[in-house]
Amino acid sequence: MAKVIGIDLGTTNSCVAVMDGGTPKVIENSEGARTTPSIVAFTKDGERLIGQPAKRQAVTNPDNTIFAVKRLIGRRFDDPMTQKDTELVPYTITKGKNGDAWVKAGGQDYSPSQISAFTLQKMKETAEAYLGETVTQAVITVPAYFNDAQRQATKDAGQIAGLEVLRIINEPTAAALAYGLDKQDGKTIAVYDLGGGTFDISILEIGDGVFEVKSTNGDTFLGGEDFDTAVVEYLADKFKAKEGMDLKTDKLALQRLKEAAEKAKIELSSAQTTEINLPFITARMEGGATTPLHLVETVTRADLEKLVAGLIQRTLDPCKKALADAGISAKEIDDVVLVGGMTRMPKVREVVKDFFGKEPHTGVNPDEVVAMGAAIQAGVLQGDVKDVLLLDVTPLSLGIETLGGIMTKMIDRNTTIPTKKSQVYSTAEDNQQAVTIRVFQGEREMAQDNKLLGQFDLVGIPPARRGVPQIEVTFDIDANGIVNVSAKDKGTGKEQQIRIQASGGLSDADIDQMVRDAEKFAEEDKKRRAAAEAKNNAESLIHATERQLEENGDKVDAGLKAEIEAAIAEAKTAVESGDIDAMNAKAQALTDKAMKMGQAIYEKEQATAASPGAEAPKADDDVVDAEFSEVDENK
């Protein structure tokens, strides 16, 4: 049976592992390295380079060397984060035909999924060279805070690379698998994953082979690339102040700065000071003569820590939210597992130690542990690893828009996946023959404040009064975190469904903004939801009372009928005003009048039934019961 491999498709570096004799083994690539740079380049001769060969020629070929493409995967071109990236990278980011962010290299446009697929192909070939057989199946990891579009695009990349992606799993969860496979005692751990382009924090309970994710949070645009950028801008600003020339406008110089910044950042994890020496970084034209300029700068660890202090602090807010969602305090965490190359930075470790109040666990290789966890999950799926159960979660709430523009959540964030949930809704108007199902992702109370993932129509509903048709909406999130939504008319059996496509995915900025907005405007959201609910309640009551009055007006005396009509008019005026208190007050007043009408109808029926020789037809009893049911339903 062919082996299933585990791949950590990283922003900066990628890694592949396989189960070998019951333990995960990281496989060295053709250059003898255990990790491969996630870089793809196209030479002037049309040759495609992947990994270290691509990285080596980046300085001389910046336009056609693509790096950190994971930050673009599943992202729209118009996304603010995409636009930010266009200013930071030497290659060209273009707008794809579907509105997604693509890249231009070697005279062609490529989707981020295609570029990622080239790296995955390298991982596939690395595994095949080691195993001596063809590899067709893989488990691929993604940041825990990746949205549906990004997960789908990652799965597409695997398919382009010739791999059947058996499972997409979250990077912190994979790291926990590798960390806790041999641990039987129950523990609550935090996985702090600061990689090349993304940050994740996950809280898990592990023990007896069960790995249960309690909560997850993160920032999909925060990682080592941002640390490099901070150093690049620091060096460029220093050079501009000294020489009066902006190196950021020169693609070749920018690429050299980036390489030097990354190298300095790494060196300062073990040294207190480093010198950046870039001879002939640019030249000045003076009086027809060219004067070469050199960049020589000493950077200390303290300098670096000052430059990136804000970035490190940004990781703590998701940590606080993850702990709150899990319902535990930092003191209750038994172990903190560090994942991602940036966690080698002493300042990062110091901040993590201060936040959680304990020394972080450093017994795993932060660059390799995710791939090892992916290999373990591959072993589970293949049947080679027994007695391991992985319970992951979805990072954001999912729901649909209902009457009044309310976001009705079907699946809350941090719900264990795979999961499936159904709810029955009805029509908002009489004789409505079609409904539009609008699917949203986010934490805000009103649908318009969340991200629209997609929409579809369910048509052919038989004409009926509002509230009569039964439309069952089902949300289904698979083990990969990919969403399917369906709607079914229970009366006719007609069904329509949608799989959210990558082109409709959320941006990193959208997700972060949703959560921030939800906290910042919590009170405003509650008021808007309360207003929508008050309006829905009042309109529903008006509709029901008008219908009852129309059908039973002859059984109510003129005085009460006039009172009810006046109460209906006042309720309508309150609805038009949009005032919550007024709508609730007038709805209550109308409810009282409707109850009086129901009582009057009942007494009239009782009197008729009690009169000599009178018979109370069963049908009339049924009608009265139905009327009571209707009034009760709309209180």
From Swiss-Prot:
Compositional bias of kind Acidic residues: 622-635
Q: Which residues form a coiled coil?
A: none
Record keywords: ATP-binding, Chaperone, Nucleotide-binding, Phosphoprotein, Stress response
**What is the induction note for this entry?**
By stress conditions e.g. heat shock.
InterPro entries for the chain? ATPase_NBD, Chaperone_DnaK, Heat_shock_70_CS, HSP70_C_sf, HSP70_peptide-bd_sf, Hsp_70_fam
Q: In the UniProt record, does the keyword Lipid metabolism occur?
A: no
Extract the ranges annotated as region (Disordered). 606-635
* A Pfam family: HSP70
- Family (UniProt): Belongs to the heat shock protein 70 family.
- Record function comment: Acts as a chaperone.
Q: What is this protein called?
A: Chaperone protein DnaK
Species source reads Novosphingobium aromaticivorans (strain ATCC 700278 / DSM 12444 / CCUG 56034 / CIP 105152 / NBRC 16084 / F199)
Q: Give the gene that encodes this protein.
A: dnaK
